[in-house]
Amino acid sequence: MQRHVHRADLGERDPDYIRDYLPWLWLVASAWFRADVRGLENIPERGPALLVGNHSGGNMIPDTVILTMAFSTYFGAERPFYQLAHNLVLALPALAPLRRFGTVAATPENAAGALDAGAVLLVYPGGDHEVSRPVWQRNLIDFDGRRGFVRQALDAGVPLVPVVSIGGQETALFLSRGAGLARALRLDRTLRLKTLPISIAAPWGLNVGDFLGHVPLPAKITIQILPAIDLHERFGPDPDVDEVYEHVVALMQRTLDELAAERRLPVLG
């Protein structure tokens, strides 16, 4: 039986908590990952928007943490910003404070609720499929054909903002998604997990599932935020979902290729 995912309480996000912890968390992220976030000015200054990103780094989600810190530093903690994550990530004790930074379970209902409330929302269409891709695919945008983010933006009538990151998939040696193992253990039915990633990561060595998290390698992480897309202005009064999807993925892949060309060595950047 599939585990029920509850509708998020958007009030769990705590601007005072964010203001208290933001300076030193941003300092740690900047020092460990040499974080470089570009294009924050491309996020609309006010009102709701849907940020769509590629996802890397396993359950430790370094790209999410860095972008959340950068957003709150740039716009202020009072501007509502939410991030969708797998329910299992929110269950990890080490990541429980993310709720107070605005992380909520990835469901269409929670996404609609955040956008209806006028918030900026970050989604990762690739989810567990993309975040657990093997290291040799680290520079590949792979949403697994998931187009829900396009429909979400159209239904809410909000601009779509592509966000491209690089470096997160170098924080451990990801070897396999473990999709067959996840099916064999029926994790797709019990935990909504279609993957059981296999990696080599500190401090465990061989790491199956990443349920306890890991100590990420200090890979340089760069995040590029692209200009917002008004879907009706760009694609007409009745945008074709497939056309929008292909355009966004191609745009993000070109940007990821450009970011990859800047890097000289894995981890070091």
What positions do the PLM features span?
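Non-catalytic C-terminal accessory region of glycerolipid acyltransferases
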Residues: 1-18, 113-269
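Membrane-anchoring hydrophobic helices of lipid-metabolizing enzymes
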Residues: 1-110, 178, 250, 257-269
